[in-house]
Amino acid sequence: MVDTHKLADDVLHLLDNRIEDNYRVCVILVGSPGSGKSTIAEELCQIINEKYHTFLSEHPNVIEVNDRLKPMVNLVDSLKTLQPNEVAEMIENQGLFKDHVEDVNFQPIKYSALTSNNEECTAVVARGGTANAIRIATVDNPVNVNKLAQDSINIAQIVPMDGFHLSRRCLDLFKDPQTAHKRRGSPSTFDSNNFLQLCKILAKTSLCKVSSHHKFYSTSSVFEKLSKTFSQTIPDIFVPGFNHALKDPTPDQYCISKFTRIVILEGLYLLYDQENWKKIYKTLADTGALLVYKIDIDYEATEERVAKRHLQSGLVTTIAEGREKFRSNDLLNGRDIDNHLIKVDNIVHIRND
């Protein structure tokens, strides 16, 4: 079993070491289907946030949100802007770019939009269209810390790769839609274009620094330091999740807020050495604030886990069908991950048998 408390300590240690140079740190957590990566990511996130909530309960009124950000950065200034007529055409096509659904070289583009909460934002879309959109909220009204419930302030946030599954409608437009649906979960059935763009956005926010008029000492805790260095000018970033009942992405399910100082990215292909995936590691590693974990587990253990999950999700009607689906798709993806793991020295291997 994985010691998630030890992982939490390692992540907080990295944040403590990098807090003068990085606004946030990132964690990559990779494993084959059924390896437990989602559960580990959720536990890790919960442990860190609970630790911070305990600190806040013992140190009321410690939080400060200021605008002393260096550098002031436009997160998507280099992206092409869609014109209103182009946005209208995209919407008419059910939020898709019909000619680019399989184009892994398609460059993400931006346009003005609204979040699901009706807030003004910049939407970033790629070959998966609006189903896999990233939405960056407009920074306007200052945060009133006094009106925030302390237990609502979370410094860690998970970002599952699952939200970047290409929608079923998108897969319908593939040259071979039958194979695309059968092999859903393979590398080509994710919007790797926009996930890489998300990593570029996160890297930019990571490299921002917030100056503080407080002098920190060697005895200052990491929670004390980050509580004094929240920035008003870091925008909230909304990313999609995945609805297993609907079998499609869910817009704006996760929010990487200005209070998020630790982003836990989990998924199958975040260390994959092919197409857009191969650029993710370097994009985040170049910030100097990254931890990378690969979960190792025997395929015999994952087969039963995944077969039961397929049954519970309604993808199959019997456990035997679940095992067959695992062997014809999930097992192939797991072996593909192991055969195409990027070659870097700082991947920490952990077992979850």
Curated annotation (Swiss-Prot):
Enzyme Commission code: 2.7.1.-
UniProt keyword terms in alphabetical order: ATP-binding, Kinase, Nucleotide-binding, Transferase
Residues that bind ATP: G31, S32, P33, G34, S35, G36, K37, S38, T39
SUPFAM superfamilies with a match to the protein in the record: P-loop containing nucleoside triphosphate hydrolases (SSF52540)
Group of enzyme by EC: transferase
Membership in a protein family: Belongs to the YFH7 family.
Function: ATP-dependent kinase that could be involved in endoplasmic reticulum membrane assembly.
Full protein name: ATP-dependent kinase YFH7
Annotated organism of origin: Saccharomyces cerevisiae (strain Lalvin EC1118 / Prise de mousse) (Baker's yeast)
